[in-house]
Amino acid sequence: MGTEMVMVHEVPFPPQIITSKPLSLLGQGITDIEIHFLQVKFTAIGVYLDPSDVKTHLDNWKGKTGKELAGDDDFFDALASAEMEKVIRVVVIKEIKGAQYGVQLENTVRDRLAEEDKYEEEEETELEKVVGFFQSKYFKANSVITYHFSAKDGICEIGFETEGKEEEKLKVENANVVGMMQRWYLSGSRGVSPSTIVSIADSISAVLT
């Protein structure tokens, strides 16, 4: 292959992945927390998009600087809502139980859907399915969680790979749940990883120039 990997806090990410078409690494960062002045890193994140899709769907933000975009929640709302293929690749840095990760995701998605009066029985059932998928797993260092969001039909395929095991997959088909899962990583000031938000803003600003 000969493709140079991109290092995100010492975690290698491919600069491009092929789904139905090539998607480029346009955002990278980490989730972390500071404990007693020490930075503890949990995951490294890569966000993959097609630059031509970005130009088509986000042209309204042409001419904005990365700093302007990073502080504009309307921009990130448009990104999450845009009918374009997206892949979010999450690599585990600090080991964690899958159940802990699942609960974080569940709480965020449920609370934000409830805020918008979109949390009904169908959403609850689908979210339980997602939590159940992660429940029994152990996220060793270098395990990979992949979210592959389809362009139009509100479907997300979640993949989980860990050392020595075949990738497991789950299809999520409730558009409200899928949309809010995207926003967990792509929602500007409320995104789970501020460093990823800044990186996406800088990259998309450059693409739109």
From Swiss-Prot:
Lineage of producing organism: Eukaryota, Viridiplantae, Streptophyta, Embryophyta, Tracheophyta
Give the induction text: Induced by PAP1.
GO BP annotation list: flavonoid biosynthetic process
UniProt xrefs under PANTHER family: CHALCONE--FLAVANONE ISOMERASE 3-RELATED, CHALCONE--FLAVONONE ISOMERASE 3-RELATED
Q: What is its EC number?
A: 5.5.1.6
This protein's species is Arabidopsis thaliana (Mouse-ear cress)
Q: Which reaction does it catalyse?
A: a chalcone = a flavanone
Which gene holds the coding sequence for this protein?
A: CHI3
Name of this protein: Probable chalcone--flavanone isomerase 3
Q: In which pathway does it act?
A: Secondary metabolite biosynthesis; flavonoid biosynthesis
